[in-house]
Amino acid sequence: MTAPADLSPTLQLACDLIRRPSVTPVDADCQTVMMQRLGDAGFKLEPMRIEDVDNFWATHGTREGPVLCFAGHTDVVPTGPVQDWQNDPFDALIDEHGMLCGRGAADMKGSLAAMLVAAERFVADHPDHKGSVAFLITSDEEGPAHHGTKAVVERLAARNERLDWCIVGEPSSTTLVGDVVKNGRRGSLGAKLTVRGKQGHVAYPHLAKNPIHLATPALAELAAEHWDNGNDFFPPTSFQISNLNSGTGATNVIPGDLVAVFNFRFSTESTVEGLQQRVAAILDKHELDWHVDWALSGLPFLTEPGALLDAVSSSIKSVTGRDTKASTSGGTSDGRFIATLGTQVVELGPVNATIHQVNERILASDLDVLTEIYYQTLVKLLA
């Protein structure tokens, strides 16, 4: 069934946003809708279009006192085969089971709607609140993420903007809304390793150097290496090879080089420099002719128990009756950029069971629960 007009304000806004096909980095006027609502609520608006990416920064309150920022993204991943969906992925339907179906329902237009409605209600109820309520919204989270939150944070840092606490609306929950929040993320360090050999005929191996044979022991050692033990907040650092390419396709040619793509998801117990040095030592130990191109996607960050995590946890408890679990599992998020400002960052959003899948969906009523959790958190920190 199509979402009826008598839905809650949060669900009405969520459906409006989902119906806008904002496949990364296209915003499809989602931010126009959000800025109009925030402007009407008295927020100061600052659009920041950077290259082909739409972003905005919005604030309500004074420069004196703490700042609580809601952060999120309007872009979504591609739908995949439309014919495999139970409905058009941009129709925003609520089915007979009460599930809100559509691309972005969980990741993360539902959260955006809940944040905005909670903030509207809070500034109406507490017009003279402490500090500031802020929004940092981008259309470049699901893509390269070069001109989105990262670029906005760089601008905010350059002018010494204060940002004490941040709630990122990523879908953190696993079974029930609020059962898990993310209080940190592992770092992500990628690499493209090239091992050079010498091309030749398979019948004359003495005239060639097979990079597959040469590199295999080193790759096996890298895969077996114990990088660290993790800690109370993070599991041990992991190393995974994702791609191996070598050869011409012919059966009688020894290849001239091998390319391996691998990734570290690393804890706060390891550093970028330390991991790079240990990789180099292993490759040199095996006397390889090698080169590595490194790509750092993000450093690990952690928000330890304190004002933000306490406020979020107690709000979840008061609204749902549930105790929440703080976790650092999963991939990277834009929280990694915001944390560089020294900000306490917590991710809290809907159930993530169907994110990036065909028939992405969440329980529609969860968005009203999420709205109340966000509202109560605002009250605890800024009222």
UniProtKB/Swiss-Prot annotation:
Biological processes annotated in GO: diaminopimelate biosynthetic process; L-arginine biosynthetic process; lysine biosynthetic process via diaminopimelate
The UniProt transmembrane annotation reads none
Q: Which cofactors does it use?
A: Zn(2+); Co(2+)
Q: Which GO terms describe its molecular function?
A: acetylornithine deacetylase activity; cobalt ion binding; succinyl-diaminopimelate desuccinylase activity; zinc ion binding
User: What keywords is this UniProt entry annotated with?
Assistant: Amino-acid biosynthesis, Cobalt, Diaminopimelate biosynthesis, Hydrolase, Lysine biosynthesis, Metal-binding, Zinc
Q: Where does Zn(2+) 1 bind?
A: 73, 107, 170
Pathways per UniProt: Amino-acid biosynthesis; L-lysine biosynthesis via DAP pathway; LL-2,6-diaminopimelate from (S)-tetrahydrodipicolinate (succinylase route): step 3/3
Superkingdom in the source lineage: Bacteria
Residues binding Zn(2+) 2, per UniProt: 107, 142, 356
Q: What is its EC number?
A: 3.5.1.18
Residues at the active site: 75, 141
Q: What class of enzyme is it?
A: hydrolase
Q: Which reaction does it catalyse?
A: N-succinyl-(2S,6S)-2,6-diaminopimelate + H2O = (2S,6S)-2,6-diaminopimelate + succinate
One matching Pfam family is Peptidase_M20
Q: What CDD domains does this protein's entry cite?
A: M20_DapE_proteobac (cd03891)
Per the entry, the cofactor note is: Binds 2 Zn(2+) or Co(2+) ions per subunit.
Functionally, this protein is described as follows: Catalyzes the hydrolysis of N-succinyl-L,L-diaminopimelic acid (SDAP), forming succinate and LL-2,6-diaminopimelate (DAP), an intermediate involved in the bacterial biosynthesis of lysine and meso-diaminopimelic acid, an essential component of bacterial cell walls.
Q: Which family does it belong to?
A: Belongs to the peptidase M20A family. DapE subfamily.
What does the record note on quaternary structure?
A: Homodimer.
From the Swiss-Prot or TrEMBL record, give the protein name.
Succinyl-diaminopimelate desuccinylase
- Give the organism the record lists: Pseudomonas syringae pv. tomato (strain ATCC BAA-871 / DC3000)
Q: Which gene encodes it?
A: dapE
